[in-house]
Structure formats: C-alpha cells, structure tokens
Amino acid sequence: SYNLRLPGYHFDLEREIVGSIRYIEKRLAPEGKKVKLFLWTGDCIPGRNALVWTQRAGVMNMNGGDTLATRSLPTVTEVEGLGIEREGLFQVFAPNQNENVYTNEWRGPFYGFERVIETFEFTEQPRRLKPINIYFHTYLTTKVAGMRSLDKVFAYALAQEITPVFASDYARK
C-alpha cells in the first residue's frame, strides 16, 4: 500500500475531506471562492462513507475510472461510463486518465502521456463519448520526455474545436 506513516496521525474522513475543503477555501482560493468539486486521490475508489462526507460538505466528487482506448486497444470496452453507484451514492469518473496510467505507473516510458491523444481521437468518432480532459500530476514535468508529451497534448487540445466546460459543471451533469 502507498502511504506515509506519520507518528500520531489517525485517518479521519471528516478531517481529510472537510478539512481539505476548508484549507483550500481559507488559504489557497481567492477570497469568497468556494470549493465545488472534491477530486479523489490514490486508487480513487472511495467507500460510501467518503461519498457521504462530500455530500455533507456540499461538494460534488470526481476521479477514477479507466478510459484507456488507444490504437493498441481500439475498443469501446476500454471507455468507462460516467461513473458508478456506490451504495446509493454516485462517484463521477474522470473523463480521461492521467499520465500515471499511460506511463505504466510512472515506470516509463515517460513520454507515454502523449498517448492520451489517441484516447481523445478514439472517443471523438463517430460521436463524442468523452470530453477532452488534460488530467496530469505536476511530477510529469520532472522528466524531459514527460514535459514534451504534455506540450504535445496541450498543442493537440488547443488545435481542436471545443466547448470549454469546468470540471464541476461536467460532474454536475
């Protein structure tokens, strides 16, 4: 399991979810701006209690899913749905996957994220199945190949005729 053992720390969903929201609103966001969307981290498989806490906090939630249709996997079975019901609550899946998936969990090839373009193209025709969503972690830019792949992905997206939508609006639909 991927975790950092911290002396004296005990996992608490309220602290993790509500505490994160409060921290962002008080210290990071512009004054008066409210958090609308909570993005799951790690394996992105929240339990029902985690979904309950986002609901109590008045925010939507998103991440997870494994849309990975590419030229080497050209099948709609590699396109995830909009999300999944978890014991009466709904988790919205991210439209596309991040670099971690395309780089074999950051083991390489580090240019692998450019393959998300194949996913964008596959889910575009004959009709749009998933929106273009550039979802990456900043560590991608620690490798030259990762930075170049990100440049390619942004260049591709900017060359498309798109309708911009905030992630919070996508999750609401």
Protein language model features and the residues they cover:
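Short acidic, S/G/P-rich loop/turn micro-motifs used as interaction or catalytic elements
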Residues: 139-143
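Metal-dependent polysaccharide deacetylase catalytic core of the NodB/CE4 family, i.e.
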Residues: 1-49, 57-78, 129-133
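Solvent-exposed, polar/charged alpha-helical surfaces in well-ordered, non-transmembrane soluble domains
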Residues: 18, 22, 52, 148-151, ...
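Alpha-helical scaffold elements lining the catalytic groove of polysaccharide deacetylases
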Residues: 2-29, 81-124
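Surface beta-strand/loop "capping" patches
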Residues: 171-173
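Eukaryote-specific, cytoplasm-facing alpha-helical/coiled-coil scaffolding segments in long proteins
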Residues: 44-52, 76-84, 160-164
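Structural alpha-beta junctions
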Residues: 56-62, 154-167
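Short conserved micro-motifs at the rims of enzyme active sites and ligand-binding pockets
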Residues: 73-74, 144-147
